[in-house]
Amino acid sequence: MDKKKLLLIDGSSVAFRAFFALYQQLDRFKNVAGLHTNAIYGFQLMLSHLLERVEPSHILVAFDAGKTTFRTEMYADYKGGRAKTPDEFREQFPFIRELLDHMGIRHYDLAQYEADDIIGTLDKLAEQDGFDITIVSGDKDLIQLTDEHTVVEISKKGVAEFEAFTPDYLMEEMGLTPAQFIDLKALMGDKSDNIPGVTKVGEKTGIKLLLEHGSLEGIYENIDGMKTSKMKENLINDKEQAFLSKTLATIDTKAPIAIGLEDLVYSGPDVENLGKFYDEMGFKQLKQALNVSSADVSESLDFTIVDQISQDMLSEESIFHFELFGENYHTDNLVGFVWSCGDKLYATDKLELLQDPIFKDFLEKTSLRVYDFKKVKVLLQRFGVDLQAPAFDIRLAKYLLSTVEDNEIATIASLYGQTYLVDDETFYGKGVKKAIPEREKFLEHLACKLAVLVETEPILLEKLSENGQLELLYDMEQPLAFVLAKMEIAGIMVKKETLLEMQAENELVIEKLTQEIYELAGEEFNVNSPKQLGVLLFEKLGLPLEYTKKTKTGYSTAVDVLERLAPIAPIVKKILDYRQIAKIQSTYVIGLQDWILADGKIHTRYVQDLTQTGRLSSVDPNLQNIPARLEQGRLIRKAFVPEWEDSVLLSSDYSQIELRVLAHISKDEHLIKAFQEGADIHTSTAMRVFGIERPDDVTANDRRNAKAVNFGVVYGISDFGLSNNLGISRKEAKAYIDTYFERFPGIKNYMDEVVREARDKGYVETLFKRRRELPDINSRNFNIRGFAERTAINSPIQGSAADILKIAMIQLDKALVAGGYQTKMLLQVHDEIVLEVPKSELVEMKKLVKQTMEEAIQLSVPLIADENEGATWYEAK
């Protein structure tokens, strides 16, 4: 007999998460009657994902019955102060219940009780009846119910990403049992539920108290023995409040529910009525997935499989998709391609058609409308086909419209399309089972992808136009894709023998450090084992336990723990040194060797559509993460050399570009003046913040502190974060920040204004209309909202800086082509561009690169680019 599985869903919180997961597409999700449908759609996607993964035999969705519960009777302010529920969300709630009815899923609410109590009660009943239980919620309150029979999953991102809590996982993550999780909430309180807790007790302090005393009751039993402190005073004063908070936070597992497990059997949906409901909501893709006949849906896709190409199959309006079987288009295989012409769709797996004179000539002379141009240009270059810059890149268009989701065609289909598309993992399989099916089925899958691209292209164009983002696509992202493709194709020469020499040298250093660690430890052990290291440090050597936390797997030996221990224990400094050199050895010195191809070069891939700020990232391998602060990390750059003997590498790096952008955006007169006068910005800041009259009187420590404040402000740092960075008290850090804002009022005004704007719009923009969506900017959770506010402050700065570098790269590429230079752009790392320059062009090129970067855009402060050249990247940096 199959195991009984119960799926319990906190409907109120999951629906709320679904609403905000698709909040940025709110206006797109409307049916013909004008009803917003994003929460309904997102809720259905979550349900489908859970049903497929959990395969429950029984299921219930529990809802809150109203604002008045037994908890509000004992504490009137319970859940007080919550923001008003958006009307666009409230209007969808009845239809979510209707969706559940058509899906054959029981839903239930109970007067005077919350959804959590219904779930808790059914959870205990199901345990007694031998069920395996999965609980799903958007709030962490239900974590207290996890045990050997019950997994609690908390939605993290979008509609399909969850964090699964078991007792072991909770112990590993927080060092707590499920019962202690309730006590933690009693101590901390919960702003989203308006549970008071104990004054000034946060998560870290709460966990520390519980690890020492076991429970809330244990804390108060031992309170007399605690040393006098403000925390002790708060615990004593708020004792009644703490126990009230525990009662409020504890789920009632004996609620008087009027349903039983026998009422929750899941038998599947009412297909006919669910299909009608999808029609009413305008969910055409879901309707197709349900495979219900509809006048709006064709029975099968009309496309033509071709083995040869003629001119009448091609048009300047054709849309192309080239299918790669794998991720790395430098090495993985092209397996087929599809294109449109008028209302016809063509598909083939005959790669030799790329050499057909008619087709090759068309591809090389036409600016293509395509999905993922950079991939296609690099791929087709391997077949001797040299593409021009694109006319329209559908993948980049989607990225500019929304950075919340990935940019795969299946995602584009779900957000903007009507054609039902199976995602690649489902279609091809994964791991060792990944394979291409028989030809007709495979080409039909490609044709479905093309159908999505054809139907969504005009939608994406219209939305970009509405957002004022067409210039961002046409003048920045698409030209940049062309430049990046050329850089990737060029690659950079890497001397494997240099890496092998470094590997041998590092092995000696690692062996020496290992022996020194053994001597200080008084025994041999596995230095790479966190568990063995934890036992050695905290049991055998007796280092203070307050520096770590103990989980089920042992003592934490994370970097932050070791860094705090290093000043009092010489062995810890050696262990930190060991870890650094071992990481450099495995990840870079050895790791990079695997990425050197037959031409002696590394061809990294620049991911243009990943980050939410617009910054580029680098993969296969990641060259942006090569350590720059440690000399052992910098030495790796010695292996990166020019391809030709009579050439050098030239590195040009923007100086303090984010602070310059901050000066421009904030219009702060003092920051602008400092940059315009060419002052050392950190010295200038130190003088204003610390009241120093002359630059010569600014000490190295003053400048270091000012630098930390300058860059901290860019990232919305708190007094807590700054105090950690500088090793000072939070009071001192707060004083630094307060004085900074007094001395630079334009910056404070900018920060306040950009957060206000983000709350109103739900997003922020760079100088070039690049958007960063902030669905959590109005969150009821203080920490989540605070992170969104810091993101709102930083994103226009970091994003604008990234955009300026992109403009410089595009202009520099144009200048190199126009001048007929042999110089090639090879790498882009953070704010740096690396070029290979023939020595005969070096003088002219240094002037050209510097001028191009510094004149890429006109700001209210000058842009400065610093240059260095050398025989290796190390020397050029």
Curated annotation (Swiss-Prot):
EC number of this enzyme: 2.7.7.7
Annotated ranges, domain 5'-3' exonuclease: 177-270
Residue intervals of the 3'-5' exonuclease domain: 302-465
SUPFAM superfamilies on file: 5' to 3' exonuclease, C-terminal subdomain, DNA/RNA polymerases, PIN domain-like, Ribonuclease H-like
Presence of keyword Lipid metabolism: no
Alphabetized UniProt keyword annotations: DNA damage, DNA repair, DNA replication, DNA-binding, DNA-directed DNA polymerase, Exonuclease, Hydrolase, Nuclease, Nucleotidyltransferase, Transferase
Catalytic activity: DNA(n) + a 2'-deoxyribonucleoside 5'-triphosphate = DNA(n+1) + diphosphate
TM segment ranges: none
Pfam families: 5_3_exonuc, 5_3_exonuc_N, DNA_pol_A, DNA_polI_exo1
Gene Ontology terms describing biological process: DNA-templated DNA replication; double-strand break repair
Class of the enzyme per the UniProt entry, highest EC level: transferase
Homology family: Belongs to the DNA polymerase type-A family.
Subunit-structure text: Single-chain monomer with multiple functions.
PANTHER family according to UniProt: DNA POLYMERASE I, DNA POLYMERASE NU
Function: In addition to polymerase activity, this DNA polymerase exhibits 3'-5' and 5'-3' exonuclease activity.
Name of this chain's protein: DNA polymerase I
